[in-house]
From Swiss-Prot:
Name of the coding gene: mraY
PROSITE patterns: MRAY_1, MRAY_2
Pathway of action: Cell wall biogenesis; peptidoglycan biosynthesis
Record flagged with keyword Hydrolase: no
Provenance organism: Mycolicibacterium smegmatis (strain ATCC 700084 / mc(2)155) (Mycobacterium smegmatis)
GO biological process: cell division; cell wall organization; peptidoglycan biosynthetic process; regulation of cell shape
Family annotation (InterPro entries): Glycosyl_transferase_4 (IPR000715), PNAcMuramoyl-5peptid_Trfase (IPR003524), PNAcMuramoyl-5peptid_Trfase_CS (IPR018480)
Protein name per Swiss-Prot or TrEMBL: Phospho-N-acetylmuramoyl-pentapeptide-transferase
Reactions mediated catalytically: UDP-N-acetyl-alpha-D-muramoyl-L-alanyl-gamma-D-glutamyl-meso-2,6-diaminopimeloyl-D-alanyl-D-alanine + di-trans,octa-cis-undecaprenyl phosphate = di-trans,octa-cis-undecaprenyl diphospho-N-acetyl-alpha-D-muramoyl-L-alanyl-D-glutamyl-meso-2,6-diaminopimeloyl-D-alanyl-D-alanine + UMP
Amino acid sequence: MMLILIAVGIALAVSILLTPALIRLFTKQGLGHEIREDGPPSHAKKRGTPSMGGVAILAGIWAGYLGSHLVGMAMGGDGPSASGLLVLGLATVLGGVGFIDDMIKLKRARNLGLNKTAKTVGQLFAAVLFGVLALQFRNGDGLTPGSAELSYVREIATVTLAPALFVLFCVVVVSAWSNAVNFTDGLDGLAAGAMAMVTAAYVLITFWQYRNACATAPGLGCYNVRDPLDLALVAAATAGACVGFLWWNAAPAKIFMGDTGSLALGGIIAGISVTSRTEILAVVLGALFVAEVTSVVVQILAFRTTGRRVFRMAPFHHHFELVGWAETQVIIRFWLLTAIACGLGVALFYGEWLTAVGA
């Protein structure tokens, strides 16, 4: 537990201190955000706000993760694990794709970065690499970071994927989550605040998996997860970095995370869900992100098939703005919904464990 607190503290400190430095740097260089040309009129005042704050988030996550491990190793503990490094590697590669996208937007002074093909290729590369490596690095207990068995709160033994199908599954999961967080990042602090809650929930889940791991505490309800404590450190560092960034990103935002941050954070959810064997449970925890990306899909399908739009604008947080909700109302209400979803997800996780142990 001490290492988890250290990861949170370091990540928060790095993020909250580095972000204002980025604000000054990007402002001096004139690297301001361009808004959607068809976006809500109230967003016009956001033009010119520095972007690419995801650099501070990623720096905070890595600092929190590595810093907690330095302390742990000084006390005789283990170093970074394959699972933790795979998740952070996935997030970093996706963040790199987002960084290129952000830079192109800023250079062109338009809200148009990488074309869809280039962006998809970048996400595909990250997902395939993650999927292939997730089935490697078998430890002494025979566990790999990922599992070919589909998982709810633990592996579903009746649904086993061939290695190639598992990699394809990872492509779907990574693409879905990275795009979901990307679409959610449209209001000041919305994505950062929601992400902090989801990863905080994952701290509880993965730490519980660590305390009830089959490798150290075999018995009813134990979990076959390769590196649950390390995943808790990744989740804790992410939560801390998001809170630190939120200090500057809360309405009215002084900086935006950009695709650098949103794609990376989507990678965090995707990576942790796969390596903690909770791919289906993640849909409950990240219900806001799921709803946001679903609204975009529904809007596109409805318009192409009927010529009519379901929402005034998608992602649907903009719909609520256009029907009269203030931006801060949308943000706070969506945060509340995220808190409820995370509470429900943790309750489902714990309830399944109680059932497994016969309580």
